Amino acid sequence: MNALLIALPLLIGSCSDDNNSYNDPATVPTDIIQTVVKTTDNISIGVSTDKAAYKPGETVRFTVTDGTLPSSAHVRYRHGADVIADENIGSTSWTWTAPQADYTGYMADIYTTDANNQQTIYATIGVDVSSDWARFPRYGFIASYGNDRTSDVIASELSMLNRCHINGLQFYDWQYKQHWPLGGTPDNLLESYKDIANRDNYTSVVKDYIAQAHSFGMKAMFYNLCFGVFDDAKADGVGDHWYIYTDQNHSKCDRHQLPSDWKSDIYLVNPSNKDWQNYLADRNDDVYKALDFDGFHIDQLGDRGTDYDYYGSQVNLPNGYASFIRAMKERQPDKRLVMNAVSNYGSDKIVS
C-alpha cells in the first residue's frame, strides 16, 4: 500500500500537461545503468542434485544426467535476481557449498555466452537450503513394498522424487495391522507379511526405501490411523472398553467397511482413551526400534457423525485428535508428526 501511495503522485505528475520536463540521459548516474543481456532458452540438458534439500553450509553435488554440456558452459547461482556466484563448470559433475542463510531457495542456471554477449540457458534447477524440512514441506508417498521393488527400482523412483525436490515421504499401507503396525517384533521381524489389502509386504523393501530416502535428504514417515483396529485386535491386547459406537448401548461398533477380500474391516476406538494411546504408543516404540522412521503420519476418516464411547457418552473426535497428538509427541518428542485433516475435519484441533 505504501508503494502505491508514493507512486501515485509521481504518475500524476509525470502525466500532467504542464510538465514538459524529461530525464536527460547525460544526467543519469552511470552506476545505476546495467547492460541488458539478451537471453534465449535451449532446455536440452538434464541436471540433478544429490539431495532434495540441504543444511546451510552443506555441499551440493550437481550432475548432468542427459544431453551434452557445452565446453564453455557456466553455472550461475542466484537468489531471485541476486547472483551469488558464477563459475565455469568444466565437467558433468561439480559441487557448490550452500550459503549459510537458512530457509532460502536458490536457482542454478546452466548457460553459455556467445561473442555478441547473448546467453543461452540449457538447464535450471532449484536448491532448497533449509535445516528443517517442516519449514517448506514437499510431501510425496510410497504405497507398494512387494519383492518387485528391487534396490534399483527404488533408486529410480526416489531419484525422480528427488528431482521434484520432494523432501518428505509418507509410507502408506506399509503396516502389518492397524493396531500392530510392525510386522513381528523388534527382536523377531517378519520377512514378509500381508498388508491391509492382503498384498505381500517385505520388511527388507521397507528398510531399503527408508535408507534410500535418507540418502536423498528426505524424511520417512510411517502411516497409520489414530483410532483403527482389526477384527482380531482384542487377541492382541486391545481393551473391550476402548471402542466407539454408533449407539449409546455399545451394541454397534463404528467401523470402516473394506472389500471382502481384504484383511479386515477397520473398527474404531476412541483416540482420546488413555489406555489406547499408551497401547499404540508402545506399538510405535517397537516401530522406531526396528525401523529408522523419522515420524508418524497420522490419519483419520473424516466426520463420522454421532459416536459414543462404551459408557454412552458422546465422543468428540476433534478433541480426541488433539489429545492423541499430544500423547504421541510426549512419548517420542524427537519424532515428527503429520496429521491428515480429511475434508478439513477437526483441523482447528489438529493444529492447536
What are these regions (language model features)?
Residues R138-F141, L169-F171, A220-Y223, F296-I298, ...:
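Hydrophobic faces of well-ordered beta-strands that scaffold small-molecule active sites
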Residues H165-N167, H214-M218, D292-D294, P333-R336:
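Short, well-ordered coil/turn segments that N-cap beta-strands
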Residues S131-S151, F222, C226-L291:
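Active-site-adjacent "subsite" loops/lids of carbohydrate-active enzymes
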Residues Q175-V206, K234-P271, G302-N319:
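Aromatic- and acidic-residue-enriched carbohydrate-binding clefts of CAZyme catalytic domains
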Residues Y122-K177:
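An acidic-aromatic substrate-binding cleft motif
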Residues I32-D132:
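Beta-strand-enriched, solvent-exposed domains that form extended recognition/catalytic surfaces
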Residues L8-I43:
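Bacterial Sec-dependent N-terminal signal peptides
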